[in-house]
């Protein structure tokens, strides 16, 4: 017998171009995991592809094949043990050779592989491990040619990508470069053991009154020789053991233990309670010797997607532990094109930003990867719900038998790997593949329920989403909701606003509607929508090397914006709404104002609709993050620098949020004639679970003078509906013949004497307003070793006061509207005494 030992093979690797045959062509690999672009950069063979036009200079890498090699010594293997070579991820077409003999051929980036090499390592001493990585870019083209009858309809990247189980964004997307990576992208190691815990998972039954729960822990054991193994299970909370049970392992290598938990501490998304994690451990024992020990954290909670007929159609919202959750959040793309460079610390910083921004759900998009364990660990610990796509995006995927088998293995592996995470509340079959079906006119008869028929149509991928994947989820994670696609709703058109989820791109893409009416364009769950904005100047400085290129329409800036037609779209929304500028810093700021306003109008209205029989169940903006320094829809850039939209969304998602808006007057289709009257509305949105009392004030303040133009409205002792919307004014009226000067509607709400939320509605568009000479004052009123408090006041209304984003500095709020008589405080952490104060900018400055 031997206790399981692991020997990471992270050092001592070298690599070379497959076409190079000389011994001096080998170059050292600093560390594995890595991909070839990282290793080429480390050897000064490649410039940073994220800077300038260097992506073009890296394109040669896309069409190359590579070999990685290392020499290792056979580990000591006691009698009765085996030696396994374990690969957690190979990218992608990999032929693995041990001492010249092929032991594995891989064609799926998303699949871990294990090879028993006990016999291959019988000889003592050194052994040579080589991995040939064939060019995925060229292999994909070959595979496409082999099936000319298949309709290769797709958006983004070369259509041949559909034939390869590799991160689809590597072929380029409308926010990312074409960087075809290859390499050992996740850990590789040797394992020596006589028996091991191959899998450990739990199934949880929570009583309806939440006073008790039943936790069943399951284990699968692999052993070299049969024998009387025993599994010692322990259940712990906060490091303290609650109970334990020892069970004999069956002949087929399984064991389970059931624990009754009284008064369990539940796992909640942040803002609703503690994200409590229990820990289940199993120790595999034989003859009193521990052979292997595995622990996993899990949560006790229920999670449902509620779909029921109502006056709006059919609902689509999430319920956790019996509580309806409005899921305000973001879509997530891979945080880097060079995936091994993302550390656990960087993942955690991203999720911490989500919490800081009051976002409760993150959608792992289907054109990237099944994320690293540390990503989901952070979501578990910080209470962020995960919408998890399977890795299919924007295409009509072929269904060759060998590809279907690979997809099944991939989905089984990843569902099993991730099923213990309480943060994952939904698995979704694909991203926008049903939209491709619609736009390409592919056959989709929802009433035909025979999967074999689907394979015979020109949309065979339906078989993956409506048979293969739901069967895997049902078998391996039966408590998790499965949804065939995003967007999708009961087989209806993907733009149907009455059912399922929808991607609303008629702001920016499509009909390019005014962002001021975004809330009228939504559906039951808005899982994509967005607006582009430039990142901050510090990020531009990173990838634009030449000062002469720092103007809004420079070639290098256009190169770093991969969205088709971005010039026209950005120009349209700027010219419609703002006084434009030609200097880069102001242009950056103006695009950020547009993005922040767009997100605010969408989120604010959709959250209000939550209170109307769950008309809108959630909103996930496109997108939270970037995979390289770029100009995109991200609200936080590659370097984790929030754009103003991040703060605008956070305010709308406040647990108690006040909202005010006047009806939209479309100036661009009325010859810019001003309206004679305007209706306005005032409401409160609350995610609190109990009714609370509050006081709401609405003031009407002149943009030009800062004075009140009419008597303020005050609602005292308002009963605020729990987890819903309280409408205070639905038929307010502004008579512009009486109140002709432009004015803002400034709303505030107090609860228990504390001012908890604000909202300011402005006359639209901003370009018609004179926003000069505001009388703004930003004053430091306290300072400690690493924290400052600023007091902000103004004589006239100020729009979108944005503070500089600086490395290591966190701001409590930004992108703020400031009005007279309502001083606001901002806390800055990480700014040391003596550091230069943060710069700031506001509209009209």
Curated annotation (Swiss-Prot):
Pathway: Glycan metabolism; N-glycan degradation. Disulfide bonds: none annotated. Its EC number is 3.2.1.25. The active site is at residue 432. It is an enzyme of class 3 (hydrolase). InterPro entries: Beta-gal/glucu_dom_sf, Beta-mannosidase-like_N2, Beta-mannosidase_GH2, Galactose-bd-like_sf, Glyco_hydro_2_Ig-like, Glycoside_hydrolase_SF, Ig-like_fold, Mannosidase_ig. GO terms for molecular function: beta-mannosidase activity. Belongs to the glycosyl hydrolase 2 family. Beta-mannosidase B subfamily. In contrast to clade A beta-mannosidases, which are likely secreted, clade B proteins appear to be intracellular. This is Beta-mannosidase B. It comes from Aspergillus fumigatus (strain ATCC MYA-4609 / CBS 101355 / FGSC A1100 / Af293) (Neosartorya fumigata). The lineage of its organism: Eukaryota, Fungi, Dikarya, Ascomycota, Pezizomycotina.
